[in-house]
Amino acid sequence: MALFKITHENRAVYGGEKFARTVRCEYEYSKAQIAAMLPEMTHKFRCRDAHGITNFWGVCSESNSTAPLDCVGADHGCTEIQYKNPTTGRYETL
């Protein structure tokens, strides 16, 4: 499973709650291990709900992982994850 970090949230969706954090759903890592993995998180993603509203953005260690959606997306109504294509600059649904 990929390591990912939520970098921005849609405050209108969360009512201003702070949500940015590093997440690893199935396993716990030490702060040193997470710090070592942060440079690998270069793949930008966003998670959207069924109405096309982006609930949060982040970076992931893999470009084809559903981990952000699986771990926190459902709790926030997200049904879709998109990764930013580095060539076109556009987000594409996984």
Language-model segments: which ranges?
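A short beta-strand micro-motif
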Residues: 6, 33-36, 40-49
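Short, surface-exposed binding/anchoring microloops in extracellular/periplasmic proteins
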Residues: 14-39
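Acidic, low-complexity, intrinsically disordered interaction modules
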Residues: 51-90
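Generic detector of solvent-exposed, compositionally biased contiguous segments
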Residues: 6, 22-26, 59-62
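Generic structural motif
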Residues: 18-21, 45-47, 81
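Short, low-order "capping/linker" segments at domain edges
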Residues: 93-94
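Polar/charged alpha-helical tracts
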Residues: 1, 31-40, 85-90
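Transition segment at domain starts
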Residues: 1-17
